Amino acid sequence: FGPLRLANGGRVGYRFECFLALREEPGDAPYRALYAGFPHPKNICQSAHLIAGSPGLTRGNNIVFFPENIAAPDVPDKQLYALFFFNKFKAIYETITIPSWDRVGRPEALVASRGADARDVYEARCVWGYLHDYFHHRGPRSFDEHIGVKTRWFTGLREELKVDLQSFRVCRAGGVPHGAMVAEFILFDRTMRYPGEPDWSRNFDSGTGLLLLAYLAEAGAIGVSSTGRLDVDLLAVEAAGARFAAEVEALERLPDADYLEAAEAMVRRYLPAPGPGEIR
């Protein structure tokens, strides 16, 4: 119980929140093979079922508890753990993400994750969470060792997309439990749900979705088809993901000041700075 700032869900600022959760990590043979193939000794992410909690956690779209989002006198210099309420994801995905795509896109482009079993959805979302955090700890600047610089607005947007696109490519390559479903989660949740958050102009995850849409559109991986609806080219998404990750990791090798400047320039190439009187 304490003053917490939620990542999503419409509650702005710090509110007193509380929750009860039960941790569960998938442990069957396919998942053990995944953990062995992508070993993550620094893993501090915990997959869980939200059992009960305050309205901000039970009713909104927020599925994560970050201890660094607690109002406290000092900001942690590293992330100690993160708790994810993945049992909430199915309802969010089926009531927001899929309908959002179906309103504007070709329905046949979203197949593997449509109407999936609740247990499969939970385990697939755990896979996304594991791979996402695995890639946070790869590359020139491991997230846990550079949390101060990587949680700023522009560097953070690029970091989130980098690790999601790396996860997407791994899932598309095969051998990952529920890989096709996870790939759709990543692509459609980022592009369809997050930009529609109520506070989208101030929401970090919304920024990642808008940046991804702009990047994929430039790459020809997503666009308006001859039917007048959006369509995606999954092979082009894979190729764009590889380029994006390479661009980001090249900039991560720069000194801090140059890295921060280059991160802003890269984001502003796709999301221009607002003019007078415009929202961010």
Q: What are the residue ranges of the model-derived segments?
A:
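Long, well-structured alpha-helical subdomains associated
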Residues: 122, 168-279
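Active-site recognition of the HExxH zinc-binding catalytic motif
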Residues: 125-141
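Post-HEXXH active-site segment of zinc metalloproteases
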Residues: 124, 140-161
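Conserved helix-loop functional segments at active or binding sites
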Residues: 136, 140-144, 169-176
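Short acidic (Asp/Glu) and glycine-rich catalytic loops that position anionic groups and cofactors
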Residues: 104-111, 142-146, 187-192
